[in-house]
Amino acid sequence: MPAASLIQRLNAQINREFYSSHLCLHLSAWCAQHSLTGSANFLRSQAQNNVTHMMRVFNFMKQSGGMPSVGTMPPPKCECLNLEELFQQTLDDYYLRHDTLSGLKEEARAANAVKVESFLLSLSKEQDRDGKMLVAILEQVKEAKRAGLCMNQADRKLLALIERCH
């Protein structure tokens, strides 16, 4: 079983992924409310990815003899006025999860917890793909804004990008 501090940090990662899923669903609802179907669908897919990451950590902890714990959380704040703010919020959240996961990998390496480190490396690779997609989407949104496109037009361009990448 991993050290108590690693168990605590793994539980924090579970809850971080859970929050991110909740955030993506909340932002997806905002997009749907503004008839931004492509972005809404993408964010629902991202929410599912985050739940999958959460469950992977949960299952790893159980298999390693730890006791996973999912806490409660307040609803995320969504005060977005446009797609750029919305996708910046998702990217900021990704960076927070990425940094947390990187710190956890370092702690596992320092503790010589090889199984934990190996597991976290595979999880990190999955998250890196998500991060690259979010960066590409945000760049596409900024490009659409510079071109003077409205949110619905930008959303259609995003849908084409997302379909190419998935």
Please name every model-derived segment:
Residues 1-166:
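Iron-associated oxidoreductase/ferritin-like identity signal
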